[in-house]
């Protein structure tokens, strides 16, 4: 490890084998905390490459408690978080709408770190049990079309890096890995990023990880979602090809809104906004859910375009099917 850190001090990028060896040692508990800290700080200082991210993600995947779902069209909606903006749990709400429309959603997530309400916080406040084993998760997915993959249960080797990360107190490569380490090995994903500079990077990393269809998104307002308040920058990976473009609410017949209409200070407030949208109340919250659910429906091939997906999402929100999917998930997680 000392030799690897010396390379970082000399600003030498790590090749796949060296990066794999380094992260494997760290996530096997073979490296002392001060050296992990040194490695992470010096990797940051050098600048993290796409190859380094993909190599580390592959190690993290290999260490996870995985669930084999074959090569189905299931979609992850896990993004980076880290925006510092406290809005309702859009990606979680959108996941249930997409599931109601026939998509299979394997959402990877955690409790809030930079936000006050992470996906796990919301689901627990709603009454869901998120601590299921792999067999039960398969059963829930087959029945409801949605499962939540609580990161601490599936990535137990992360305990070896937590002390060093906490001492550093800033983003490290591990803040970039979560969205690339779905325990079900999802090949399709809507992946929100906190920084516009990560759009192409994450598109290329997704390609290195042999993803099939990914939308990497960043709102001009700073959100790691498709935004209702402003244009959204998109990098689409499909069948090995990258395409970059912009979309805006008007493209889908929706009006722009102020970000204050999306704000939620607590998981309870977030749930209140989502429940109102699921009851059919038209609002910027409902529009934003529709935008992001539409993207997941497109990724899952349940619709032929994001626009078609947004129309279907609106229908599912207003006819009660999204609400029913949400209720069914909560009920089933408590009955197993």
Named regions from a protein language model:
Residues 41-45, 96-100, 295-301:
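Short glycine/serine- and small hydrophobic-enriched flexible loop segments
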Residues 8-54, 62-70, 288-289:
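N-terminal glycine-rich anion-binding loops that anchor highly charged ligand groups
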